[in-house]
Every structure is written in structure tokens, then in C-alpha cells.
């Protein structure tokens, strides 16, 4: 890395002047509760930009870390959001913004759910409590939000590719600026990260990669790469560069503080220096180091910054650092909800209300039930065991559970390979992440018509995580694939039985369901097999002699909204007597119930409206249009007016799911207004 002309090396805390003897144990604090009132943070309050850090002493930087950690704790309690990962990079964030000349020097965060401290230090301190709210800060770095957010992120394993692109473009333009990519050990399991590292060596790019190794993604990191990192840790510090002619050798922190690593110790002998993967592919390697030791971080990062060519700094951190409950339960504290308001009113006994199941819980229940009946069932997830509702399945059937880490492409083709051997693989995957395995879905599964089922979670709008995590493209990119069946359940009960229906089908299928809880529907046993491509008329409102007849074709979660909007129309003084409404639960996106469509048109419907929590362009409504315009015999004789209701041609900003639906006109009132305009 070339030295920036604005580097702080001449300031009060140069790399050579760092006092590594500062008593960290006396300055670093651990908290047991999330504060409800804004804490006193005098040092942090003086930081309005990274430039304000440059005059801080070593002790002040460590105290700042304590204040920043407490402030992030408080803010997360106010707004909810990603939690453990942010607490684990407080010291690293301070060190980077102290050492680098941001925003001229570029910091790229992988995934971005660990960037809260970065937002605070770059002028957004007083807005942090608004994070993930509709008018507040975004959950992840976003270029439109700040000049310090150099690359928009949200998905995993992209930082090294993006950072390499920046570095090469800067080199081409003759600009000497440092690019630093921060990537976690979980994200490093993604193949894209290795593709980028391979190219960084090929290009001999000046690129700093900081591997934040906390042995976790959302849950514990797994696989051969995780074991390799553990072996590097067990081997002690390994550094390739000399400081004033002497090798840098730093005392390793107390292993008791990192006892999660111990489970790897017996898996293989301690590696030799030549076993280092990063060195083997051509990176200069520093580490591993204690990622919570600011003086040590500054010294190592300062030296790494001077290296020409690609360099990797390996640090070890604790997810949830400084908050005792999160250190003990890093999975449970990956993200939190906002603290409930304090209620000092007298408590009264209330009737117990049975909470609705989450759709991921419905999937988990189906998975366990079916696995107990069919030994051919195998389940795959790309690092989403908890989120996809698979914990109990993994406990009951560990030999049939495959967590492949953050490797969506591999997950899909792995399932294809399994299917060739007479088993039934189920790939549990979020809609937004299935996009990453699209080529494999087409080429390695659908083209061969292999017996693979996709359980697609987080479909539709997902709320506070915003556009990066929205699952609003899957109807479009799946329904154009031959051999593909696509089901969209209206509630928990239908989800369970559609999962069973698709499981029993021989071929490539997908069941698409949303984030969060269902409608409260009871799952009726035993499991049923629905007729493929058959819709259900939920209700008929109005009389047969009404001059206007509307067929409201709803897909998935929009069935309940359609029913409520139809009931509003039926009660409307202007429309009640003049309109008959058929509310249809389409249930299947592919194949459509074309027999029902023909019947509705033949019976003289005057208007057809489709309703989906998906992009209008290319979605289920488009499938209805295509059939009616290109194949329907009845439509050639009688042409009702068609309206497609869904998500418009734009990315939907973060906010609650209810706010997002209202913003798109997909809440009950919004749908009612659109139907009213259609019928007027």
C-alpha cells in the first residue's frame, strides 16, 4: 500500500509511538444490560468526522472504544438491529478511521451489518437511533447516505471484489489511495471472496484485506476453511514483515478468552508456516492478532498499509464483545428488537393468546415430520440454520442436515448431485440469496429435471433490512425456467400442505413464503397433497345480476388482503350494488389454473385484477396476462379490463413491512383504492 499524504503518522499517535502497555483491562468495560437512557460519552461527542480522531492519545482511543460500544448498545436498544457483529468491530473501526485518510482512502465493509460504529464516526452519531426506520439510516452502508460509504452492501462475500475494482481503477488513474476490505470468516466461505483474492494476486493490486475472524457468521462458522483459520490461530502469530529490522512477534492473548477455538485443536496437528492458505496463493499475511487491542491494531495496520501488492491482516474478535449476554449467546444476539417501552401501569391478568407460527417454524415442523416418514429426505442450507427454522431438524437428523456455509451456488448444485442418487434434497434458502445460485438452478437442476425442492423463505418485502434483502424477484426469475413448479401459500396451513405436495412431486419445485408470522391458521393433519395448478375461489361477494364483475386473483400472502379489500368494496355505497367480486386464491404461479381463468372469462367477468407481493414486471400478474393474451380462447371473444397490482418498478426503501406495503399500495386501503379506480 502506498502512504497517503494525509496519513496520521506525524500526529500525536504515530504507529511507532503507540503505547502498547496501556492497561486495556482497566479501560475496556463489559456490560450486562442495555441502557435505556443515553449514556455520557464526552469523547465520542467530540467526534463529528474521522479527522477528529487524529489528535487522540492511545488511552483516549481505548476510552473512546468503551464509549462507542456503550453508545451502540444504547442505540440498538432504541431501534433494534444487528447487534453482536457491531460490538465486535468497535476497536477495528476506530483504528481504521484513525490510521486511514477517509473518505479519500476507501473502506469496504462486507455484508455491512457490522458498520454501526463506522456510521457513528462518520457524522451520523445522532441519527443512529433511527437506523432501519423508514426515515432513518439504512441498515447497511449505502453510497447515497454518506461519502464514507464507498460501496453498497447487504449480501455476503462481495467486499474483496468491490475493493479490488476500486484499487485497479485508482491505479489506472494514477491515484495513490488505500483500499481496505473488512470481511468476516463466515463471508470468507463464499466462493466469490476466493475468486477475488485469486485475481488480486494476478493483478498484483495494492489491496488490504482485513479478515475479522470471530468464528461466526450468523451462527458458528463451519467447514474446512473455518478449521484452517483455527489452525492458524493455534500456531501463534505469523508475520511476514520486519519492524526496524526485527520480526514482529506479539504475545498471543489468553486462550481462555477464545475457548471456542479449542474445539478445533484436536482436529489436526498445529500447522507449519507453509500451511498458510493466504501465503500460498500470494498474499502477504499478518496475523492472527487480537482485534480488540487498539495499539496493536494500529501498529500492524500501519505496517500492512506500506506493503506493495495484496496483503491480508488476520484479526481475532469476539462477537458481542463487551455485552456479557451476547458474548455467551452470539447467535441469539446476532440481531435484536428494540426495547419495549417501560410500563409502570398495574398489571392485570390477561387471557393467554397463542402466538401465530412463523413461516420458518412451519417449514421446520414439516421438515421434521416428513423426515420421520421418509428416509430419503436430506436438507441443505447455506448458513441459515436458525433463520430457516432447521435447528430441530439438525438436532434430530444430524446425518441428513448439510450446512454448506455461505455458498449458495454450491448448495444448489450439491442438491442436484444428491438427486441423481435417488434421495430427495430440500434446499432451504432465502429468496434474495437464491438469486446467487440462479445459473446452478437452471443448468444443474431444472435442465436435467432433477428431483429437488426449494423452500424459499423471506419472499416479498422484508422490512427494516430494506432493498438488499427483499425477495421480490423470484416469481419472475423462476417462472421462466422450464420444468419448474412454483407454489405460493396464503397461510401457515396451506404452506405446510404445499410443502408436502411439492415434496411428493417428482421434479423441480419451489414453495415461496414470507418472513415473519402467519395469519394464525391452524395446521390440519395429516399432510395433504393438493392438485397441482388448481386455484381456490375463496369467496363471491355481490349478486349475479351486477353489471360489473371483478375477478380478484391473489397470490400467496395477498389473499387475506384481497379478501379484506373486497369486503370494503362490497360495503361501499358507490360500488356495492353494481359489482360482484370473486376472490381467488391462485395458490400456484406455475402452472396457473388456466381452467379457472377460462371459466371466469366465459362467465362474463368485466374486470380482472391480479395481486401479488412481488414486482409487477415479470411477476404472477404478467403470467396471467401472457396466458389471456396468447392462449385463452375465451379472451379472444370477451375481453375484460385487466389490472396488475404489485410492487412498482423501483427498489423499496427500508421501513417496517407494514410501511413498505403501504408505500407500494399493497396494504388493504391501498388495494381498495386501486380496485375502486379500476371499477369506476
Swiss-Prot record:
Any GO MF annotation of the entry: 1-deoxy-D-xylulose-5-phosphate synthase activity
Cofactor: binding details: Binds 1 Mg(2+) ion per subunit. Binds 1 thiamine pyrophosphate per subunit.
Keywords linked to the UniProt accession: Isoprene biosynthesis, Magnesium, Metal-binding, Thiamine biosynthesis, Thiamine pyrophosphate, Transferase
Binding site for thiamine diphosphate: 113, 154-156, 186-187, 214, 323, 408
Enzyme nomenclature, EC number: 2.2.1.7
Biological process annotations from GO: 1-deoxy-D-xylulose 5-phosphate biosynthetic process; isopentenyl diphosphate biosynthetic process, methylerythritol 4-phosphate pathway; terpenoid biosynthetic process; thiamine biosynthetic process
Catalyzed reaction equations: D-glyceraldehyde 3-phosphate + pyruvate + H(+) = 1-deoxy-D-xylulose 5-phosphate + CO2
Binding site for Mg(2+): 185, 214
Family matches, as InterPro entries: Dxylulose-5-P_synthase (IPR005477), THDP-binding (IPR029061), Transketo_C/PFOR_II (IPR009014), Transketolase-like_Pyr-bd (IPR005475), Transketolase_BS (IPR020826), Transketolase_C (IPR033248)
One Pfam family from the record: Transketolase_C
Coiled-coil annotated residue ranges, if any: none
Region (Disordered): 1-20
Cofactor(s) the protein needs: Mg(2+); thiamine diphosphate
Gene Ontology CC terms: cytosol
SUPFAM superfamilies per record: Thiamin diphosphate-binding fold (THDP-binding), TK C-terminal domain-like
Ranges of compositional bias, category Low complexity: 1-17
HAMAP family per UniProt: DXP_synth
Similarity field: Belongs to the transketolase family. DXPS subfamily.
Subunit and interaction comment: Homodimer.
Name the record gives this protein: 1-deoxy-D-xylulose-5-phosphate synthase
Organism: Psychrobacter cryohalolentis (strain ATCC BAA-1226 / DSM 17306 / VKM B-2378 / K5)
Gene name tied to this protein: dxs
Amino acid at each position: 500500500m502506498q502512504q497517503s499524504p494525509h496519513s496520521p503518522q506525524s500526529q500525536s499517535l504515530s504507529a511507532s509511538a503507540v503505547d502498547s502497555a496501556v492497561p486495556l483491562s482497566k479501560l475496556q468495560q463489559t456490560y450486562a444490560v442495555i441502557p435505556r437512557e443515553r449514556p455520557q460519552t464526552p469523547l465520542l461527542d467530540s467526534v463529528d468526522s474521522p479527522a477528529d480522531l487524529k489528535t487522540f492519545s492511545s488511552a483516549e482511543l481505548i476510552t473512546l472504544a468503551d464509549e462507542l460500544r456503550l453508545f451502540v448498545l444504547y442505540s440498538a436498544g432504541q431501534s433494534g438491529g444487528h447487534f453482536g457483529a457491531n460490538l465486535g468491530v468497535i476497536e477495528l473501526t476506530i483504528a481504521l478511521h484513525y490510521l486511514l485518510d477517509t473518505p479519500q482512502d476507501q473502506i469496504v465493509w462486507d455484508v455491512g451489518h457490522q458498520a454501526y460504529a463506522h456510521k457513528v464516526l462518520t457524522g451520523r452519531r445522532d441519527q443512529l437511533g433511527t437506523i432501519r426506520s423508514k426515515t432513518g439510516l439504512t441498515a447497511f452502508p449505502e453510497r447515497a447516505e454518506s461519502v464514507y460509504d464507498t460501496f453498497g452492501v447487504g449480501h455476503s462475500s462481495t467486499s474483496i471484489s468491490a475493493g479490488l475494482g476500486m484499487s485497479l481503477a485508482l491505479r489506472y488513474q494514477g491515484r495513490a489511495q488505500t483500499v481496505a476490505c473488512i470481511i468476516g470468516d463466515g463471508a470468507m466461505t463464499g466462493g466469490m471472496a476466493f475468486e477475488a483474492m485469486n485475481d488480486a494476486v494476478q493483478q498484483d493490486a495494492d489491496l488490504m484485506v482485513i479478515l475479522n475472524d470471530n468464528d461466526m457468521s450468523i451462527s458458528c462458522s463451519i467447514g474446512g476453511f473455518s478449521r484452517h483459520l483455527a489452525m492458524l490461530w493455534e500456531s501463534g502469530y505469523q508475520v511476514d514483515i520486519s519492524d526496524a529490522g526485527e520480526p514482529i512477534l506479539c504475545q498471543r492473548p489468553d486462550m481462555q478468552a477464545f475457548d471456542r477455538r479449542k474445539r478445533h485443536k484436536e482436529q489436526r496437528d498445529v500447522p507449519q508456516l507453509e500451511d498458510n492458505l493466504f501465503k500460498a496463493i500470494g498474499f502477504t499475511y499478518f496475523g492472527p492478532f487480537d482485534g480488540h487491542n487498539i495499539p496493536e491494531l494500529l501498529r500492524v495496520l500501519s505496517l500492512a498499509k506500506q506493503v506493495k501488492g495484496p496483503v491480508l491482516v488476520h484479526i481475532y474478535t469476539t462477537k458481542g464483545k463487551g455485552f456479557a449476554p451476547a458474548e455467551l449467546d452470539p447467535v441469539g444476539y446476532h440481531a435484536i428488537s428494540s426495547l419495549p417501552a417501560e410500563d409502570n401501569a398495574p398489571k392485570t391478568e390477561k387471557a393467554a393468546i397463542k402466538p401465530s407460527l412463523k413461516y420458518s417454524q412451519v417449514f421446520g415442523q414439516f421438515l421434521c415430520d416428513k423426515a420421520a416418514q421418509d428416509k430419503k429426505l436430506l436438507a441443505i442450507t447455506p448458513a441459515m440454520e436458525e433463520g430457516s427454522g432447521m435447528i430441530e431438524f439438525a438436532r434430530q437428523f444430524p446425518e441428513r442436515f448439510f450446512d454448506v456455509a455461505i455458498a449458495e451456488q454450491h448448495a444448489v448444485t450439491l442438491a442436484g448431485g444428491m438427486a441423481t442418487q435417488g434421495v430427495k434434497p430440500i434446499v432451504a434458502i432465502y429468496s434474495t440469496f437464491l438469486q446467487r445460485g440462479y445459473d446452478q438452478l437452471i443448468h444443474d437442476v431444472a435442465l436435467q429435471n432433477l428431483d429437488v425442492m426449494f423452500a424459499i423463505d423471506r419472499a416479498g418485502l422484508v422490512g427494516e433490512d430494506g432493498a438488499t434483502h427483499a425477495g421480490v424477484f423470484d416469481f419472475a426469475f423462476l417462472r421462466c425456467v422450464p420444468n419448474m413448479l412454483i407454489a405460493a401459500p396464503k397461510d401457515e396451513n396451506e404452506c405446510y400442505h404445499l410443502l408436502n405436495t411439492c415434496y411428493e412431486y417428482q421434479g423441480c419445485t419451489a414453495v415461496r413464503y414470507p418472513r415473519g408470522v402467519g395469519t394464525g391458521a391452524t395446521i390440519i393433519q395429516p399432510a395433504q397433497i393438493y392438485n397441482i395448478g388448481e386455484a381456490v375461489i375463496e369467496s363471491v361477494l355481490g349478486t349475479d345480476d351486477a353489471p360489473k364483475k371483478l375477478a380478484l386473483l391473489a397470490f400467496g400472502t395477498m389473499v387475506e388482503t384481497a379478501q379484506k379489500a373486497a369486503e370494503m368494496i362490497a360495503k361501499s355505497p358507490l360500488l356495492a350494488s353494481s359489482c360482484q367480486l370473486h376472490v381467488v386464491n391462485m395458490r400456484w404461479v406455475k402452472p396457473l389454473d388456466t381452467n379457472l381463468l377460462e371459466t371466469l372469462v366465459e362467465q362474463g367477468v368485466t374486470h380482472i385484477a391480479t395481486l401479488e407481493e412481488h414486482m409487477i414486471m415479470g411477476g404472477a400478474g404478467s403470467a396471467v396476462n401472457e396466458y389471456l393474451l396468447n392462449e385463452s380462447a375465451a379472451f379472444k371473444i370477451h375481453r375484460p379490463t385487466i389490472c396488475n397490482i404489485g410492487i412498482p418498478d423501483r427498489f423499496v426503501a427500508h421501513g417496517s413491512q407494514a410501511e413498505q406495503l403501504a408505500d407500494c399500495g399493497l396494504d388493504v386501503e391501498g388495494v381498495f383504492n386501486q380496485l375502486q379506480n379500476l371499477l369506476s
